[in-house]
């Protein structure tokens, strides 16, 4: 690996995540790299984002209204040219913890154009979870070319963006399983032990993703919001203080 600058990409649009998520992603990334790193954030609202982040405005290409706040909106990153990006770029969602060095994500099979975390709820189905993926800018234009003519048709056919991308690309490569974990699916003890044991962080974990509920702050406090009271019988998490050690 050369001393060339590494690029981490995050995307923030809508109101689900505030600027503090971008700022913490920047801080966590900088603590967990030994190389020059530039953090790029594409957003529709740069308010409050720390000045060290390379902020770019989210392109406003024509989309059906129901897709404007859907993950499919990030398909623009698969165009031939994307302002501020080049080479192999590591994309991270905002609802995750960086708990170990991210340099290995750039070093892992660098000749490949796309590497992704395997989706924790679909093992063996060749579907990635696009909260964590690395891609070569400009090399995957067939994703954009397939999406752009009829976005709604792709959404209706595949329902979510990660299935669409992985099925469009065909056979995909996954990062080592122990690097990318789901808090909910990998770390919370199975019922009924989740009522008695707090989640622990494996030593080889580099990324912990918080897909769905609980959110990062809720998991720290030991809260798991539910919409139906009977779900409290099994949806439970103990307070998990190690989250706060990284989420800063």
Spans of model-derived segments:
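A glycosyltransferase accessory/donor-loop signature
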Residues: 1-21, 35, 41, 51-58, ...
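A short, conserved beta-strand element in the Rossmann-like catalytic core
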Residues: 16, 96-99
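Short, acidic, metal-binding catalytic loop of nucleotide-sugar glycosyltransferases
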Residues: 24-35
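Active-site-proximal specificity loops/subdomain of glycosyltransferases
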Residues: 44-85
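Short loop/helix-cap segments at secondary-structure boundaries that form the rim of catalytic
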Residues: 45-53, 105-109, 125-126, 219-221
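Short beta-strand-to-loop acidic/aromatic patch adjacent to the donor-nucleotide binding site
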Residues: 86-95
């Amino acid at each position: 690996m050369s001393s060339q600058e590494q690029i981490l990409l995050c995307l923030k649009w809508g109101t689900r995540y505030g600027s503090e998520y971008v700022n913490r992603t920047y801080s966590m990334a900088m603590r967990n790299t030994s190389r020059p790193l530039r953090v790029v954030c594409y957003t529709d609202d740069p308010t409050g984002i720390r000045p060290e982040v390379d902020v770019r405005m989210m392109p406003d290409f024509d989309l059906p209204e129901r897709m404007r706040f859907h993950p499919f909106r990030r398909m623009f990153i698969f165009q031939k040219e994307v302002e501020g990006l080049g080479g192999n770029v590591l994309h991270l969602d905002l609802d995750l913890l960086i708990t170990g060095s991210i340099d290995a994500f750039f070093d892992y099979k660098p000749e490949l154009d796309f590497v992704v975390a395997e989706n924790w709820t679909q093992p063996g189905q060749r579907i990635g979870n696009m909260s964590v993926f690395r891609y070569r800018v400009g090399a995957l234009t067939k994703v954009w070319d397939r999406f752009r003519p009829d976005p709604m048709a792709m959404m209706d056919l595949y329902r979510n963006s990660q299935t669409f991308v992985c099925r469009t690309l065909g056979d995909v490569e996954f990062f080592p399983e122990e690097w990318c974990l789901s808090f909910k699916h990998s770390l919370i003890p199975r019922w009924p032990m989740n009522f008695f044991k707090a989640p622990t962080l494996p030593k080889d974990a580099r990324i912990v993703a918080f897909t769905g509920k609980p959110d990062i702050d809720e998991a720290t406090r030991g809260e798991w919001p539910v919409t139906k009271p009977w779900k409290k019988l099994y949806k439970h998490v103990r307070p998990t203080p190690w989250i706060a050690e990284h989420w800063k």
